[in-house]
Structures are given as structure tokens and as C-alpha cells.
Amino acid sequence: MSQEIISINQNSKIKPHLFHLVEPSPWPILISFALLVLVSGATLFMHDYRFGTYVLICGVVSVVLCLYLWWRDVIKEGIIEKQHTTPVRAGLRIGMALFILTEIVFFGVFFASFFKASLSPVGILDGVWVVTEGIWPPLSIKTFDPFDIPFINTLILLLSGSTVTWAHYALEEKNQKDCITALGLTVLLGIFFTLMQAYEYHHAAFNFTDGIYASNFYLATGFHGAHVIIGTIFLIVCYFRAKRGDFTNNDNGHLGFEFAAWYWHFVDVVWLFLYTFVYVLGK
């Protein structure tokens, strides 16, 4: 009897493989609730509810905390547990590529809305929506000079794309010093872009509720600005990981930095389209 059990157990052994069987994690469900709080807080804040600000802050803090703890586990799986094998890295790359594809569709909706409004402008006359052919932007809107702050921001992002590429090449050459320097410059350029965007918003001659042009403008550039902030945080994490030697001393590659670079180049390309169509052609 005991020999049969031993035989069955031996025959039922799982063969070794290169795939990572993820252990149960609380972070997906927790970040779902955190995002619910974040979106609810943003809605309450935009409708001027008294406690909306506090709910929004709680949502932001919850999302950041969950992401930090989740990414910490992912880094541990790759660096310490060596779970990021070649097939796992290939799957992660496919996942990141699909994520960026969804982001392209996301911004494509804003561009479609902007083109629809600009190619067939409408306005309100005596309380009735009427077509105002050829008048775009609306006469009540004072647009930004595309060769002022927007042009400076374009140069900033193009330069940051060069520095993040420099960091990538430095990593490939195992040059930790140049990688850290290039990442630091990229982070500073990202922060500078965000500050310039905030300055532009502060001095804007129109607000979010001033018609279809204003709402399209703030939605498109605002979400892009949010992506720049997220990308900057992504690169800050990579900066400190590079200083710790996680990339240059890791046989499993540098997926974290690779994905941050993909994301940053995506942000650069989106801005070029925004600058061309919203700032230059939309003036």
C-alpha cells in the first residue's frame, strides 16, 4: 500500500518549467477599491461637494500606496526570486505593448472629438445650437501662442526623449554612472514640463466650461499632463533602482526601465500630435 502511494506521488510530480506561477496577491482587489474612491472623490470635487477634496486625497494616497506595495512585490519576484525568466519577460512585454495600445485608443477619442468639433463648429444662438461654419476656435476663445510655452514644452519633451534613450544605451553597456545621470536629467525635464504646463493653465484666458474648444483642450492636454506625471514617477523609481544597481547587476534584464522608456516615448509622441493639431492647427 505504501509503495503504491509513493509510486503515485512520484508519477504525479509537476515537471519543472520556466513560467512564473503567481502567488495569491491582495493588491489587484485593493487597488480596484482605491480607484473607486479616487474616481468618486474626483466626481465629488468637480461638483463642489464639501467633502469631495478629502475623498479625492484619500483616493490618490490609496492608489499610490497600493501601486508601491504591488510594484515592490514584482521587483522582489524579478530580482530576488529570479522568477522573470525569458518566457515571463516576453509575456510582460506583450502586456505592456497592449497597455500602450489601449492608451493610443484612449487619446484617439480626444482627437476624434477635437476634429469633429473643429471641422463642423457649432455655437448657441438665442438658446439654439447652430452651425457656425468656418469659425474655429470660437470667437470668444483667446488661444495660446503655439510658439511660446507650448513650443518650449515640445523642446523639453524631445530633449527628454533623447536623455532616456541615452540612459537605455548606457544600461546596455553596463555603464551605471551615465545611466544614473541620464535618468536624473530625464526626471528633471519631466518635472520642468509639468511646471510649465501648470503655468500655462494658470494664465489661460478660458476655463473648462467655456465651450467645446475649452473642454476638448483641457481634457486632451490635462490627461497628457497626468501621463507625464505618471511617467516621471516611473522614471524616479528607475533612477533609485539604477543607483542601487538593480539593472546593471541583474541577469534578468532591466524590464522596469525598458517599460518606463516605452511609456515615456509614447508620451512624447502624443504631445507632438497635441502640439500640431491643438496648438498650431487649432489656433
Residues covered by each model-derived region:
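...captures the hydrophobic TM-helix bundle architecture rather than a specific catalytic motif
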Residues: M1-K283
